[in-house]
Amino acid sequence: CELSNITIVLEKEECGACVSVNATWCSGYCYTKDANLMYPQKSEKQGVCTYTEVIYETVKIPGCAENVNPFYTYPVAVDCHCGRCDSETTDCTVRALGPTYCSLSQD
């Protein structure tokens, strides 16, 4: 479980544009084990590679109307560890949209 470089796509529907930025996020493997069949009532905690600390960076999205805030702030991982996925701050699903997904049509 460690920091890795990634390109993510940021978008604001009101601006009609997507912007690619370089960031870091956590990826890799964490030690896991299956539940003991002799003691099924004891559940094992399965750790995921997640961030310990993040900072926030801001980028200006082009093409915004005057009445729209053109700035987009996004998290960048600074440190990683194996732990529980916090669904309050993290998308813990397997079927999330990819980091390069843009819902706006690109010419």
From Swiss-Prot:
InterPro entries: Cystine-knot_cytokine, Glyco_hormone_CN, Gonadotropin_bsu, Gonadotropin_bsu_CS. It is found in: Secreted. CDD domains: GHB_like. GO terms for molecular function: follicle-stimulating hormone activity. The keyword Metal-binding does not apply. It holds the Pfam family Cys_knot. The keyword Secreted applies. Keywords: Disulfide bond, Glycoprotein, Hormone, Secreted. Its main location: secreted. It comes from the Eukaryota. One of its GO terms (biological process) is regulation of signaling receptor activity. Disulfide bonds join 1-49, 15-64, 18-102, 26-80, 30-82, 85-92. One of its GO terms (cellular component) is extracellular space. Gene3D superfamilies: Cystine-knot cytokines. SUPFAM superfamilies: Cystine-knot cytokines. Together with the alpha chain CGA constitutes follitropin, the follicle-stimulating hormone, and provides its biological specificity to the hormone heterodimer. Binds FSHR, a G protein-coupled receptor, on target cells to activate downstream signaling pathways. Follitropin is involved in follicle development and spermatogenesis in reproductive organs. Heterodimer. The active follitropin is a heterodimer composed of an alpha chain/CGA shared with other hormones and a unique beta chain/FSHB shown here. This is Follitropin subunit beta. The lineage of its organism: Eukaryota, Metazoa, Chordata, Craniata, Vertebrata.
